[in-house]
Amino acid sequence: MSMTILPLELIDKCIGSNLWVIMKSEREFAGTLVGFDDYVNIVLKDVTEYDTVTGVTEKHSEMLLNGNGMCMLIPGGKPE
């Protein structure tokens, strides 16, 4: 039998790991996943924010991202 994993279970397995978040806007975030809630609002630490239009990056120690604005979550962090 194949094993089924639910989306929130997969995100839960990523806590403490690097995560790359692509937003619906022109922003991307890469950091370590600290936690999340049922609405997939997430808390990241050691965050790098990327503006895909201007190419500008910013560093943040911690950040809360609204799950409603997310397009994609990619475990493993942003590729270099």
Curated annotation (Swiss-Prot):
GO terms for cellular component: Lsm1-7-Pat1 complex; Lsm2-8 complex; nucleolus; nucleus; sno(s)RNA-containing ribonucleoprotein complex; spliceosomal complex; telomerase holoenzyme complex; U2 snRNP. PROSITE patterns: SM. Residues 6-79 form the Sm domain. Keywords: mRNA processing, mRNA splicing, Nucleus, Ribonucleoprotein, RNA-binding, rRNA processing, Spliceosome, tRNA processing. It is found in: Nucleus. CDD domains: LSm5. Disulfide bonds: none annotated. Gene3D superfamilies: 2.30.30.100. InterPro entries: LSm5, LSM_dom_sf, Sm, Sm_dom_euk/arc. SMART domains: Sm (SM00651). GO terms for biological process: mRNA splicing, via spliceosome; rRNA processing; telomerase holoenzyme complex assembly; tRNA processing. GO terms for molecular function: poly(U) RNA binding; U2 snRNA binding. Transmembrane segments: none annotated. Component of the heptameric LSM1-LSM7 complex that forms a seven-membered ring structure with a donut shape. The LSm subunits are arranged in the order lsm1, lsm2, lsm3, lsm6, lsm5, lsm7 and lsm4. Component of the heptameric LSM2-LSM8 complex that forms a seven-membered ring structure with a donut shape. The LSm subunits are arranged in the order lsm8, lsm2, lsm3, lsm6, lsm5, lsm7 and lsm4. Component of LSm protein complexes, which are involved in RNA processing and may function in a chaperone-like manner. Component of the cytoplasmic LSM1-LSM7 complex which is involved in mRNA degradation by activating the decapping step. The LSM1-LSM7 complex loads onto the 3'-end of single stranded RNA. Component of the nuclear LSM2-LSM8 complex, which is involved in spliceosome assembly. The LSM2-LSM8 complex plays a role in the biogenesis of the spliceosomal U4/U6-U5 tri-snRNP complex by accelerating prp24-mediated annealing of U4/U6 di-snRNA. Belongs to the snRNP Sm proteins family. This is LSM complex subunit lsm5. It comes from Schizosaccharomyces pombe (strain 972 / ATCC 24843) (Fission yeast). The gene is lsm5.
